[in-house]
């Protein structure tokens, strides 16, 4: 009985996601059109590219890596 309830809840969730497909596609299209709006290069001339390099983007536990992923997103390929 519990597994039947779980199956119905999962099917209901899938149906809700499928029903809003057009709305989700519209949101995705808006984000793609405005992708550069959230990716500002505030440290273009002095830090990103000179002090912080693309290799810092892949360092998960370093301060430089955290800084690169937060402020040099264009360089890390996040944008």
UniProtKB/Swiss-Prot annotation:
An MF annotation (GO) of this entry: toxin activity
Signal peptide as annotated in the record: 1-19
Species classification: Eukaryota, Metazoa, Cnidaria, Anthozoa, Hexacorallia
Keyword Secreted belongs to the record: yes
Gene Ontology cellular component list: extracellular region; nematocyst
Keywords: Nematocyst, Secreted, Signal, Toxin
Residue ranges annotated as propeptide in the record: 20-36
The protein, known as: U-actitoxin-Avd8a
Family affiliation: Belongs to the sea anemone 8 toxin family.
Subcellular location: Secreted; Nematocyst
Top-level taxon of the source organism: Eukaryota
